């Protein structure tokens, strides 16, 4: 599928690093437009964090767009002030990358519409996109707020802190940020991290599993929210034994 979305230059994105581990980190799996589920899960996280002193970090692991029609409302929410006591960071997933490519060249990257993009555009009131590149771009410019575009274009690829690497799909745990490849971070196979020898751990989404899973080198938290109704988060704390999980599962 990735080969369908190479019709514009690579988008240069940041890779973030924190020198100090916060009091707690909460990471959220692939939301895919399910703003309703994210609101519920964020409330759980805020309630849990109320008893934890010190700064907290809330990381969304990418793929916040596509497949459901709550995308516009979700991005509005993410542009609002962070919850008290939290720093909220959204990483780029392959679906945000596809959307940005479409916005730059809608005719050349029209395949995005078949991978959930149509639902994203519907959330902005666009239910039919056709015409020349200039015509389509005009419709997109009218419908999608510039702050939403800027938000999507500015999403970082990854974040590292302590012994953890957070990325949408894959992060080579044996290599530094400077040796990572954007394509792998967005589209790679997370299972490749199982072979790492560095003693770090990848926290990722991208691949749907029935339940969140813990493996020696990685924690997987994409539980297919758009089709299962289950959105999952993991909490990590220094000195805490096992990670704690939260979800919208009834």
Can you annotate each of these PLM segments?
Residues 4-9, 70, 143-144, 196-198:
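A short, flexible low-complexity segment enriched in Lys/Arg and Gly/Pro that occurs
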Residues 104, 110, 114-220, 224-230, ...:
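Acidic, His/Gly-enriched loop-helix segments that form or flank divalent-metal centers
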Residues 1-39:
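Short glycine- and acidic-rich boundary segments immediately preceding or forming the N-terminal edge
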Residues 25-27, 58-60, 90-91, 165, ...:
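Residue-level marker for buried hydrophobic side chains located in beta-strands
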């Amino acid at each position: 599928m990735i080969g369908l979305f190479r019709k514009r230059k690579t988008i240069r994105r940041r890779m973030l690093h924190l020198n100090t581990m916060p009091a707690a980190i909460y990471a959220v799996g692939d939301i895919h437009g399910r703003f309703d589920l994210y609101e519920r899960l964020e409330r759980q996280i805020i309630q849990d964090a109320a008893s934890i002193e010190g700064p907290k970090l809330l990381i969304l692991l990418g793929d916040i767009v596509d497949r459901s029609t709550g995308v516009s409302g979700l991005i509005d929410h993410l542009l609002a002030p962070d919850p008290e006591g939290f720093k909220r960071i959204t990483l780029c997933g392959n679906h945000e990358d596809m959307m940005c490519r479409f916005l730059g060249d809608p005719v050349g990257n029209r395949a995005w519409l078949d991978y959930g993009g149509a639902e994203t555009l519907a959330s902005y009131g666009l239910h039919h996109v056709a015409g020349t590149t200039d015509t389509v771009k005009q419709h997109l410019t009218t419908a999608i707020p510039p702050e939403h575009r800027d938000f999507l274009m500015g999403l970082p690829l990854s974040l590292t802190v302590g012994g953890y690497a957070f990325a949408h799909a894959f992060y080579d745990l044996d290599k530094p940020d400077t040796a990572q490849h954007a394509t792998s971070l967005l589209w790679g196979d997370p299972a490749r991290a199982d072979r790492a020898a560095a003693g770090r751990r990848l926290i990722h989404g991208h691949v749907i599993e029935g339940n969140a899973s813990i493996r020696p080198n990685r924690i997987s938290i994409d539980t297919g929210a758009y089709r299962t109704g289950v959105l999952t988060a993991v909490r990590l704390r220094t000195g805490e034994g096992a990670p704690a999980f939260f979800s919208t599962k009834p």
